[in-house]
A protein has these predicted regions:
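A hydrophobic alpha-helical transmembrane-helix feature that marks the membrane cores
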Residues: 1-161
Length: 161
């Protein structure tokens, strides 16, 4: 598919640009965010494969509902920003902003578990070959989201110094 390389290049430029901005402001933050992202990924993968975390219908519902709430808050913040309005506290380095970022990191991490479950279910049910791409793309999107949220959390923590 022609769009895959284009997407990969654009995403690389996007993540590289954001990472460069954060790195220029907070030296060393990118390597910390990358290490934490992969640490979370591997810890949750181990917890999922050993069945320390089980994906039940209630677990799935809770994670999807929390993710939807975060999307709504970010959409309101984005649209409000276009008109000069701010959602107070969540983007600041105060205790509420850090708490919100921590909550978002946890929800992003729990979305990894849903991705693992989707992949495992697809394998068990003999899903068509093209579904591998959907599963891989979903996992990639979740990892990018987790990385960006960890980056924001670390920036807020460093901003308190």
């Amino acid at each position: 598919m022609v769009t895959a390389p284009i997407y990969a290049i654009l995403e690389g430029l996007f993540l590289g640009g954001i990472s460069a901005v954060f790195e220029s402001r907070f030296p060393g933050i990118v390597i910390q965010a990358v290490a934490l992202t992969f640490g979370v990924l591997f810890c949750l993968l181990a917890a999922y494969t050993t069945r320390l975390i089980k994906v039940t219908q209630n677990f799935r519902l809770g994670v999807v509902a929390a993710t939807g709430g975060i999307v709504i808050i970010y959409a309101i913040s984005f649209i409000g920003g276009l008109f000069g309005l701010n959602v107070p506290y969540i983007h600041e380095s105060g205790i509420i902003g850090i708490g919100f970022s921590l909550f978002v990191v946890v929800i992003a991490a729990l979305n990894l578990v849903l991705d693992f479950d989707f992949i495992e279910s697809g394998v068990e049910q003999g899903a068509p070959k093209y579904m591998e791409w959907y599963a891989a793309f979903g996992l990639l999107v979740t990892l990018v989201w987790l990385y960006l949220e960890i980056l924001r959390l670390l920036a807020k923590l460093r901003g308190r110094r």
